[in-house]
Structures are given as structure tokens and as C-alpha cells.
Amino acid sequence: MRIADYSVTKAVLERHGFTFKKSFGQNFLTDTNILQKIVDTAEIDDQVNVIEIGPGIGALTEFLAERAAQVMAFEIDHRLVPILVDTLRDFDNVTVVNEDILKVDLAQHIQNFKNPNLPIKVVANLPYYITTPILMHLIESGIPFCEFVVMMQKEVADRISAQPNTKAYGSLSIAVQYYMTAKVAFIVPRTVFVPAPNVDSAILKMVRRPEPAVAVEDENFFFKVSKASFTHRRKTLWNNLTGYFGKTEEVKDKLTKALDQAGLSPSVRGEALSLAEFAGLADALKGQGL
């Protein structure tokens, strides 16, 4: 029997008198086939350390611990810690950290792996309400995670992996794809969770690029420009950029020159631009002193 078997999950929750907290976005997976598929997608073996976020009662952790060198699971809900100690008692390669992943000194914790030099993968069922902040925090942390295999709301997975000229493409697509390749591995129906969420989920596989997807003079400025370009999706690049930089004649003149230098029409919409085109635009705007 597995932790994720519905009867086991139910028994564990009843034994510990656990009640779900909406504020933590708790939905526990009760399908062992999907858990197996997640671990297979992540290609976990004993030469990999794993960071898990939101382990719940240990359903995914159990599958990870069977294969990985070590698993470090960050759980914000202190009520789940004794449950995890109980359900994972047979594993000596799991460390449960009762901390908020957004506030911990992750680099320091990683030094506590027995072999901190092994590649580190992030494998997790992320809370829907805070998926994007967690992902961007980890991606921008400077810690060289080689791969993420994470479950999230399908809509968010579609946005992250979207390509130009699609409805889902936006500043989040650019922010993630600058650092990583991103592809939806498979869909997870809402029916396999306790309690069932209101939407379906997706497993997103992201692999870190050896170098960022494009070269830019100023990364922060590049992200600001891409975000500004999607402020109002139905508006043109010109309208969004003047809304961000200002509408003085001096600014308009600089914008005109930058767009011309980048080879872009003022009437194009942000959703039509590739990462390379956003890089060219950001550098041209920077060159104009904006």
C-alpha cells in the first residue's frame, strides 16, 4: 500500500485529526500512477538530490525517496510535520524542513545534503495560490537547479510554456523561458485530489539552459520592458510603451528611434514578439537612455 492510496490517505488524515486549510492551498494527490509518472518524467536516480515544496502527507515524497540520493521537503504547515515523520519513518534520506520556501536561506539548507555537489532537481505539487512567486524565487535564486518538474494549475503551465502569437503568451512566458526550456508533460485531472480543486492541473517540465536564451545588456530592464509590453494585451506596443515610459515628445522621439533600430512596427502587439525581439527592443530602448 502507498501513502497516496485513497484508503491510506484517509486513514492517515483521520488518525492525526487533520483538517485542510484553504489558506495553504492544500490538495493531496491520491493516484499512484500519476505519482510514478511524475518521478519518471523527472528522471530521478541516486545521483540526484531533490527539493520538494509542499509535501503534504508524503505521497510524492515516498516515490522520490525510493530513487533519489536525498530529498529535502519544505512544508509551511507545522501540523503536517508529525504526519510526515510518521508516514516517511522508513526512509533515512528525507529531511523535512518546516519553513516557508520564500523566506528560507535555501543555499544554506542545500549545504546540508550529504553530497551537496550532486545535481539538484525541484519536484513538487505547488500550491496554486503561490505558484508563480515560488517558481520565480527559485529560478532567480542563483542556485543552479538543473530541472523543475512541477504540478500547477493547467492555465499557469500553459502560460509559462506558451509561444509567441498565442493567447497564453505573456511576460510570465518570457520570464521563465529566458532561463529555462518549458514543456507541459501531461495533464492531471482534478478528480484525483482530496479535496478536489476547481480546475485541472498540469505537470510542467523545465530544464535550465546552459546560458540565458538571449543576450541582453540589462536583465532587469529587459524584464521591465517585456512586462510593460503586455500591460494591456489588446493595445499596440507603442501604446503600452508610452504608457510605461511617458508621452512627452522627447520620449516619443526616443521610442520611435528604438523601435526603428529594433526593426519593429509601432502597431505590433507584444504577443507577437519573440524573446530575441524583446531583447533587441530592450537594448535599443536602453541605448536611447530610456
From Swiss-Prot:
User: Which coarse location class describes where this protein primarily resides?
Assistant: cytoplasm
> What EC number is given for this enzyme?
2.1.1.182
One Pfam assignment? RrnaAD
Gene3D superfamilies under this entry? Answer: Ribosomal RNA adenine dimethylase-like, domain 2 (1.10.8.100), Vaccinia Virus protein VP39 (3.40.50.150)
List, alphabetically, the CDD domains matched: AdoMet_MTases (cd02440)
Where is this protein found? Cytoplasm
- Keyword set, alphabetical order: Cytoplasm, Methyltransferase, RNA-binding, rRNA processing, S-adenosyl-L-methionine, Transferase
Under catalytic activity, the entry for this protein gives: adenosine(1518)/adenosine(1519) in 16S rRNA + 4 S-adenosyl-L-methionine = N(6)-dimethyladenosine(1518)/N(6)-dimethyladenosine(1519) in 16S rRNA + 4 S-adenosyl-L-homocysteine + 4 H(+)
Query: Which amino acids does the record list as binding S-adenosyl-L-methionine?
Result: N27, L29, G54, E75, D100, N125
The chain's coiled-coil residues are none
One GO CC term on file? cytosol
Which InterPro entries did the record assign? KsgA/Erm (IPR001737), rRNA_Ade_diMease-like_C (IPR023165), rRNA_Ade_Mease_Trfase_CS (IPR020596), rRNA_Ade_methylase_Trfase_N (IPR020598), rRNA_adenine_dimethylase (IPR011530), SAM-dependent_MTases_sf (IPR029063)
Instruction: Tell me the GO molecular function terms.
Output: 16S rRNA (adenine(1518)-N(6)/adenine(1519)-N(6))-dimethyltransferase activity; RNA binding
Q: Broadest EC class?
A: transferase
Q: Where is the signal peptide?
A: none
Q: Which family does it belong to?
A: Belongs to the class I-like SAM-binding methyltransferase superfamily. rRNA adenine N(6)-methyltransferase family. RsmA subfamily.
Q: What does this protein do?
A: Specifically dimethylates two adjacent adenosines (A1518 and A1519) in the loop of a conserved hairpin near the 3'-end of 16S rRNA in the 30S particle. May play a critical role in biogenesis of 30S subunits.
Q: What is this protein called?
A: Ribosomal RNA small subunit methyltransferase A
Organism, as annotated: Streptococcus pneumoniae (strain Hungary19A-6)
Give the source lineage, highest ranks first.
Bacteria, Bacillati, Bacillota, Bacilli, Lactobacillales
